[in-house]
Amino acid sequence: MDDFGRRLLQRLVRRTPAQALKATLGKWERLTVAQRQSVDFTQPKVAVMEQLVAIFEENGWTVKHITELEMINYMENANRGMWHAFQMTDPKDDANAVEMMQFKEQFKSHLSELVRHVSVKIKKHTDEALWIRIAWGDSYSPPNHLKPTYVVHHLQTPYVFVTSLNSKQKPFLVQALILSTGYQGIKDANLSGQKLTAIRDLLMKQYQQIFPSKYNSPLTEKNETVSNPHIEREQSEHASKRLQMACEAFGDGIVPQLQTAVYKLETKFRGDANTNRTMTKREGPFRCLVKFASTNLLESFRECASSGIASTPVSPLLSSITLKGRNYFVVTENGLPSSQT
Amino acid sequence: MKVGDLSVYIDMSLLKPFSKLPALNAATILLVEREERFQQNLADALVGDTTVTVNVRLAKSLPLPMDNEESRPRIDLVVFIINLTSELSLKSAEASLKYLDPGYFLGKVCFLATNARNTSVPTERLDAMRKLAASLHCPLLFAEDQTPDGVNSATERLLTVLKVAAGLVPTATALYLSSLTRCTIPPDIDQPSFE
Amino acid sequence: MLNMEQHRGSAVRTPINGVPVQKRSKSYRLSYGSCLGAASRFGFTPTLTARRFSTTRRVSKLHNVKEKINADQLALLVKMEWKLSYVTPLYQFRHTKLKSYSRQLSVFITAEKQQGLAVDVDRVQNSYRVSFSLVHGMAGTDDAETVLIQVHSKHMFAKKDEPQKLIWSGWLTCMNGNSDYLGSLPKDFICLPLFGSSGPEDLTSLVQSWFKQNFDCCIGPLEISHTSLQWLAALWTNCHNEDNIQHLKLIWSLPVAPPLQITYTVDPQDAWDLWGSVRKGSGAEKVREEEEPGKIIDIDEVMSFMQGLNSHFYKHFRLDLSSGSLKEVATSLGSAKYNGKIKISNSKYMITTLTLLTEGALLKMPI
C-alpha cells in the first residue's frame, strides 16, 4: 500500500471510535470471518492500524477499497459534518419513474463529462437512500480522496442532502443531478444541520405531528397531573391549550433534532409605539440577525410555548421551521405575515 | 360594551377574601407562579399537613378563570412565588396583584422569593422585590426550591401564616401577624451610604 | 439549570454575613457588600446598609490613555481576554516594594510547582520569572496605582539560550472607586478590588494564594452581572459615532430544557438610532450634534434601550427575553461575559469599562 493509502486509512481509523470501526468492518463484505476476528480492537489505535495495513497489503487492496470502507463508515455514522438540504423543482413527467441503475449510470457519466478527474461511488443504504461519494479533481490534479463530498438522495423524492461541498463544485453537482433525475431545477432548501436524519425527517415530515382540531386531543389528558384531590389547577385549560398549540407547531414526542435556526430580520422597528415613537415612525428597516441554538431546538421551542415563555399562538416565524422545513429565513417587510403588525 | 358592563366585569374578576363562607377546620391557599415549577412540589408538601385540611389552588397568574368560581373555596392566603433569576417572574406577579381585592392586603398575601442567593440575580431586582412587598405591607419569605429541606421549611412557614390567615389560630389574626412579619426596607436603599 | 447550580454553588462559598477580620475597624464593615446580606432568609435586616450600582454614569470622551500609559502595557491590556476576580483591601501592600514582591512570588511559584518533583535545582531557579510593574496613568484621583504582574517561563525541554516566554499575566486595579469608601479605609490598607488574569488557571490560583497569604485579603470570582452587561451594551453603543462598533451582539439564555440560547446581533447604525431615541429629551440627531465631552447616561435610558430591543424581538417571535438572562454582550470595542470574562479591544473606552467593573468588584466583596 502506498503512502497516500496509508494516510487515508489512518485518518479513518483515527476518526472513528473503536466500536464503530468494528461495526464498519463487520458490514464490509470483503473481509473473511477469520480476518475480522483477528483484529483486536481493545489495543491502541496505532496497533489496530498496523493490523489493518497488514490485511490490506496481504490482499493487495488499494485506495479504492479504503474509500469503500470509508463510505460504509459514513453511512453508519451520518451525524457529523454539516448537511445542507436542496430541493429539486419542476419535475418532468418521468420524474417518479427514475430507477436506481439508470440513475447510477447517468449520474456517473454526466459528472465525468463535466469534471475531468472525478471519482464517484454510489451505494444503496438500507433505508433505500442512495449514497454518493464524490472525490473531486480537476484538469491537472487527480481526485482528492481526503475531501470527498457526500450526497444523499432518496429516489422519487425531490430532496438531496449534501455535505462538504464547496461553491466551485456545486454547479457541477447540480448539473449532474438535474440531468440524471427527472427534474429541471434545484434550489437551496435553507435547511442545514449536523444530523442528517433530523433534517431528512423534518423535510419529509417523518415525525409525530399534531394537527389543529376542535376536539381535545389525548394531549390534554396527559397534561393533567392530579396528584391529590385537595390540589386544583385553576388554569389547567389554559395549560392544555398551550401544550396543544406547542405540539401543533413543533411536533409531539421525539422531534427531529435540529441545532440552530437563523433569522435575518429586515423589518421596521416594532417596539412599543407609545414609549418609542421615534423608532416606530422611522423609515427603513431595523436590521438584525437572530440565531436560536439548542441541543434540540424544536424541543426547546415546544417547552417555551407550553410553559408560557413564548406566547401562544406560536409566532408564525417559529412555526415556519416545521411548516416549511427550513431553518434559515430572511424576513422582510413584505414577507412578514400580517398577524405580526 | 357600556361602561357599566366593564365595571361589572372588573368587579367579577377581583378575588375577594370574604365573599364566601369558610369551611370547617380547613384552609385554602392559592399559589401563583408564572413558571409553574415550584408550586407543584410545594402543593404536595402543603396538603401533607395533618392538623387541618389544606386545599391548594394553583395558578400561573391572576385573574382566575370565571368557570371555577362556583367550585372554588374561600381563599385564605394568596402566595406569589417569584423566581428572582427571571425578570418576567416579578413583572407577572406585579401584573396579577391588581386582581386582588384590597381586603387581601390586610394580612392575606405573601411573597415567596426563590433563587435569591443566585449570583445572576441583579441587586436591583431584589430591591424592586423588597420595595413591592414593603409597599403592600406584605411579608416576603425566601425559599430554596431545589432541595427537599428547602421545600419543607418553606411549607412550614406558609402553613404557619395560612393557619392564622384562615382564622384557625384562636389567639392571632392575619392583620396582627402581618404587622409583625411584613417586609420593611431600610431608609437608605436608594442612596449609597458610608458611615 | 446546570448553570444555575454552579452559580449557586459559588454564591454559597461566598461568606454572607461578613468575614470576621479583626484588624478592620467597624466603620467600613458596614459598607460595601453588605448588600449581600439582602440574601438573608428574611426580607428585613434592620442594619442593612445598601450600596447599589450607580444609576448614572458620566461618559467622558477624552480618555487619551494612549498618551498616559506605556504602549507595551496597554497593548497587553487590550490584547487579552481577562478573567475577573474581586479582591478585598490589601493589608500593608506597598507600591514601593514591587521588586521584592517579584522575587518572593517567583520563589513561591517555583516552590509550589516543584512539590513532589525531583528536578535539577539550577534549572528550577530560573524556571519562573515574575515581574511586578506599575501601570502609570491608570487610576482616578483617589485610586491606588494599577499593578501589572507577568510570569515568564521556559518550556521544560527548552534550550539553554532560548528566551523565556510570557505564560501568565494579571493586574490589580481600582478605577474611580467610591471616594467615601476609599477614604474610610485605615491607613495600612490599599484597595485594588479588581483582579484580572489571563493564563493557566493553576498559576492564577497560585498567584491568588500568594496574595491571600501576604496581604491578608480574600479573593473570589467576579461575575459580570445582568445589570453590568446591560450597562456595557449601552455604553458601547453610545460610542458608535466615534468608533464603529461593527455590531451589537447580545446572547441570552432561556431556562427551558434543553436550554435555549439566543444570539441577537443588531446592525450598529440601527442600534445607535435606537439608543439615540431613548436618550432623554433628545432625538438621535441632537445627540450626534452635541460635541461636549462628558455626558451623563442614566440607568433609565439603559433600561429603555434594552426594553426597545426586547420588544422588537417579542413582536417577531412572541418570546419574552426577560424570562431568561443576558449572558454575553459584544461589540468590536470589547466583549463581556456573565462568567466574568472581559475583553476590552479599544483602549479609548477602557476607563469607562474598568470603572463599571471596579464598582461591581466593590459590591461583591464580602466585608
Segments the model singles out, each with a brief description of its role:
Chain B
Residues 27, 54, 107-109:
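Residue-level recognition of the N-termini of beta-strands and the immediately preceding loop/turn
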Residues 78, 82-87, 91-195:
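Conserved GTP-binding G-domain of TRAFAC-class P-loop NTPases and closely related GTPase folds
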Residues 4-8, 52-57, 84-89, 115-116:
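Short linear motifs at secondary-structure transitions and domain/linker junctions
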Residues 50-55, 127-131:
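WD40-like beta-propeller blades
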Residues 1-40, 45-48, 52, 59-65, ...:
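Short, flexible boundary segments at extreme N-termini or domain junctions of P-loop NTPases and their
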Residues 72-73:
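A short, aliphatic-rich alpha-helical micro-motif
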